[in-house]
Amino acid sequence: MNVAVFCSANNALDPEFFTLTRRLGEWIGRGGHTLVYGGCDMGLMECVAKAVHDSGGRVIGVIPIRLEKGGHVSSYIDVQILCETLGERKQLMLDRSDVVVALPGGIGTLDEIFSVAAEGTLAYHDKRVIVYDMKGFWNGLESLLDGLQQKGVMRGDYHSRITFAHDEDELLRMLA
């Protein structure tokens, strides 16, 4: 299985996020799965790539040329795919993945979550995003989406495109 992971490239995060991210990476690697991610050598991105690599899994890094020129490419990548834009990176990652997981992240991660969900709503693909709600990180997003659903501004039930996993066991059940 190819697992796309969207997440933060920030190093200044809760240390427990790194622990949980490492465990996900180990699960991906030990299971013989492939990580598809943004290729950066910082934050949770580097953490998950290292864990997959060290656990025997394969790592595909989809890297914007701007990042590569800046010297922020992970050394744990087995297959490197260069692209021009963030939009192109999202599409290349989606095309190469069977399932999508979002870990804690910022504006870029939100963009990735919503792009996958919006494209799925319009039948460009049939994938959903599993949002791993580490320590309640995504509680505000889940509340926002529930509120939008209640107000009737969303077509259909958003849960068919975005699902929240509130702990590691729930996440691994969804991935199995």
Located regions from the model:
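Flexible, glycine/proline-enriched loop segments at strand-loop-helix junctions
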Residues: 103-104, 128-132, 159-162
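Active-site/ligand-binding-proximal alpha/beta "capping" segment
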Residues: 88-123, 130
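Short, structured loop/turn "capping" segments at alpha-beta junctions
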Residues: 59, 124-127
